[in-house]
Amino acid sequence: MQNATLSPIPLLQRSLQLLNPIYTPLLILASPSFFIPIIGEIIPVLGGVLNLAYVVVGAPILGGAALLLVDQHLKQQSPVLGNSLDQAISKAVPLVLGSILLSLIVFGGSLLFVIPGIYLGVKLAFLICAIALEGQGAVEGLGYSWNLVKGRWWGVFWAFLALGLIFGIPILILSLIVGGIAAALNLGLLVAVVIGAVTTAIVPILNIFTVLLFRSLQEIQGQTA
């Protein structure tokens, strides 16, 4: 890997450099987040069931597969969608359990005020990476992420915040524009299609960015496997 850094701009530039060869398989792994909201607009009950199943089970497994695929590419191995998905499925239990634990912890922290939730979210942001890439269990992954971010909280927070602003602000503006048009034409499905397409299209970049940040932290903290 190139020089370790927590600076968001170099990480984003590197993410874009790595994107092309693995964009299509990463997009396939992210595709349920595009189709499920559309189904929800057409058949609300079915959409609700699918969304719940995806959030609880599908997203952790597919997200883990995406991280594995990116990591294979970083290691100059031939990234194969099927292999990454098989590996993620073999870790399905810790991935799903870890995702549930993370959601409960961050939600619980947010109930105490927003700041504890943000703090915990950043400290535990690499739980899925720890499970998928380092073979940690769900509980062990919490500790792994916590220790990895130790002393680097602000750097990690800024990296994710900057990335969120870079992509989030344009998406917000687009949502307002499309939402206004959809409301005028009474086309709620238009919002789901356009916003879903845009957000799904950038998920592969977020996958790569997250793995690069994770590996950079490992190198900085001397925890590289």
Regions inferred by a protein language model and the residue ranges of each:
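Hydrophobic alpha-helical membrane segments
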Residues: 1-225
